[in-house]
Amino acid sequence: MITLTKVLSKELARSNIRVNAIAPGVVDTEMGKSIPEENRKVMLTHVPLGRFGEPSEIANVVLFLCSPLASYVTGQTVHVNGGWWG
């Protein structure tokens, strides 16, 4: 996905079309909550912010990337994961 984002951004920039990707971490949705509690605890040890994301936090990044504020942003993958490492 990262390479596709970069390639498409180069091809479509001539047409003033921006292409970006969002790489979310674990988000507190029904899918995220279906992860067994023991696994969730281990996963949280890799998140410096100490919690999983909220759907609205991912949506806010989408809104930013679609707005004029991101008019010079293309070919990027934005990691929205609370600083996840590991």
Q: Which sequence ranges carry the predicted segments?
A:
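Conserved catalytic helix of short-chain dehydrogenase/reductases
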Residues: 1-11
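A short C-terminal helix-loop "cap" of Rossmann-like NAD(P)-dependent dehydrogenase/epimerase domains
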Residues: 33-47
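Short, flexible catalytic-loop segment of classical short-chain dehydrogenase/reductase
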Residues: 10, 19, 23-33
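Short-chain dehydrogenase/reductase
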Residues: 5, 59-62, 66
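Conserved beta-strand scaffold in the Rossmann-like NAD(H)/NADP(H)-binding core
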Residues: 16, 21, 77-79
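Short C-terminal tail/terminal secondary-structure segment
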Residues: 63, 74-86
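A conserved structural motif in NAD(P)-dependent oxidoreductases
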Residues: 47-58, 69
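Alpha-helical segment proximal to the catalytic Tyr-Lys
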Residues: 10-14, 71
